[in-house]
Amino acid sequence: MAGIGPITQDWEPVVIRKRAPNAAAKRDEKTVNAARRSGADIETVRKFNAGSNKAASSGTSLNTKKLDDDTENLSHDRVPTELKKAIMQARGEKKLTQSQLAHLINEKPQVIQEYESGKAIPNQQILSKLERALGAKLRGKK
């Protein structure tokens, strides 16, 4: 095979398994700039309501209207005066401070302060702990 002259091919190179660019690749900034330089037509379209879930938030206006129309008083029950006095009296008989009582029932001293000032929302679990620690009936009929 002693050839004469340079070796040349008479066919075009074929690339196997090269995929066409997908939509994401066409939106790439580099691709768009290349298309602008070559003078190709570029269409830019903004999606309507993209990224803002308007469909989900539009239903809240009905609920807001219902809440505005509702006149009922929405508040939690607080500790009744009799219970406040009973806790203070039982604690006084046992000669315990608020922090000592709180330590006995594994609660924070602030919880006892809230119960004795009437700001707490009654919790049956805490009330039963108080009854056991103080040895007095705080709930129900005496």
From Swiss-Prot:
Residue ranges of every copy of the HTH cro/C1-type domain listed in the record: 87-141
Region (Disordered): 49-75
Compartments (UniProt record): Nucleus, Nucleolus
GO molecular function: DNA binding; mRNA binding; transcription coactivator activity
SUPFAM superfamilies xref list: lambda repressor-like DNA-binding domains
Name this protein carries in UniProt: Multiprotein-bridging factor 1b
Ranges of compositional bias, category Polar residues: 50-64
PANTHER family: ENDOTHELIAL DIFFERENTIATION-RELATED FACTOR 1 MULTIPROTEIN BRIDGING FACTOR 1, MULTIPROTEIN-BRIDGING FACTOR 1B
Main location: nucleus
Organism: Arabidopsis thaliana
